[in-house]
Amino acid sequence: MISRRVLGRGPERILGLCLGLMAGPVWAGDNDVIGQALELPAHRALIAKRQRPDTELRRFETDGCSGGLSEVWRLVADQFEGFARTYESIPPWESCCVTHDQAYHNGVNAPDARVSFAARLLADRTLEACVTDMGITRRDELAEVYGITPDQVETAYATIGGAMYWAVRFGGGPCTGLPWRWGFGYPDCSVLAGDDK
């Protein structure tokens, strides 16, 4: 269901969001000409918005892992002591998400759209690698905690890292109106409103 908040921003926001979500999987590669063609206008719009004299970067805030993952994890851990004791009170990879949010906050202040595109791709790949590496470095410890083999821990964390990568590639582009978008520290922008000109 589309929230009233999104609907209240006008039809161009909804269209932009839909186009961005449909195009998400296409721009997974840094050499993907079609993906860049779809996403670069939004990066240009973000940079144009950022360069306006009245645009201010908001203070950095993080929700941990977006999409409600950290919030739900904490809720479950608060309600079920055994869950927190076994699986920790925050997602074990939350530090990876916070680092990712720091890059997304200001879009690394990229000077142009291609640099912004590449920086976002790097941030997303770094998130995936961070989660995957955590499964490798903590494999023996977590295998004992979870009651599975170390190889299963590595596979699980690689799967989680991959899913997180695709989620942020799919829904994290600039100018989507989403709170976890690339450049979320700046006011939202819109390709359809001419911010990319």
What are these regions (language model features)?
Residues 27-197:
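Extended terminal accessory/targeting regions
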